[in-house]
């Protein structure tokens, strides 16, 4: 049985090369596979391995005070969903190319999965404002599933979002906008950019879709959540669409 993890942390990294080398060495020592991106703005990890080895790796990582508060999302599969281990140094841990959307300067307000579920049941937020759920993922991901009634955009990559959102600005003005993505990392930047661009009614879904599945299940969500590995997508119980032995 494999333990699959997704985690990220926006934090100033003054030594990305040193951190990347240490992460690679530790991940190899624990026989983990997956992908890790390191940048001056933080770290983004998708790793899988035996439960004991995953636990040892994250115990090591979170002993570093920069990552002590990192939230890790877990799921299981029978087989390893990654072919290899890759650790790369990038300009951003999620590319958006907007200087006014740096989570290092602070976070946009967020909403927990439990509160969002309540709002979905009521059809409005606690102030009686209508809800708009904004899917910040690309069109390929959306095809596997999204929240019921969500605003989805015809984009191929995250950097396309600002232009694609422009025609919808007027419709969003009187609503509470909840931005969401797979695990929360894109929402962090999207919500900040929207605020900087004059939209002060924007929240981000804490933990993204996977956090919502983990905490409250699939209420209000249609389909699965696409993931960037050989499992392809996860259902609201975090079961993989594909769980094949790639060595067979």
Curated annotation (Swiss-Prot):
Active site: 181 (cysteine persulfide intermediate)
Top-level EC class as recorded in UniProt: oxidoreductase
Transmembrane segments: none
Keyword annotations from UniProtKB, A to Z: Oxidoreductase, tRNA processing
The EC number(s) this enzyme carries: 1.14.-.-
Catalytic reactions of this protein: uridine(34) in tRNA + AH2 + O2 = 5-hydroxyuridine(34) in tRNA + A + H2O
PROSITE patterns assigned: RHODANESE_3
Gene Ontology terms, MF aspect: oxidoreductase activity, acting on paired donors, with incorporation or reduction of molecular oxygen
Domain Rhodanese: 127-221
UniProt GO BP: tRNA modification
PANTHER family recorded: RHODANESE-LIKE DOMAIN-CONTAINING PROTEIN 7-RELATED, THIOSULFATE SULFURTRANSFERASE/RHODANESE-LIKE DOMAIN-CONTAINING PROTEIN 2
Family classification: Belongs to the TrhO family.
NCBIfam families cross-referenced by the UniProt entry: PRK05320.1
Function according to Swiss-Prot or TrEMBL: Catalyzes oxygen-dependent 5-hydroxyuridine (ho5U) modification at position 34 in tRNAs.
Name of protein: tRNA uridine(34) hydroxylase
Organism: Xanthomonas axonopodis pv. citri (strain 306)
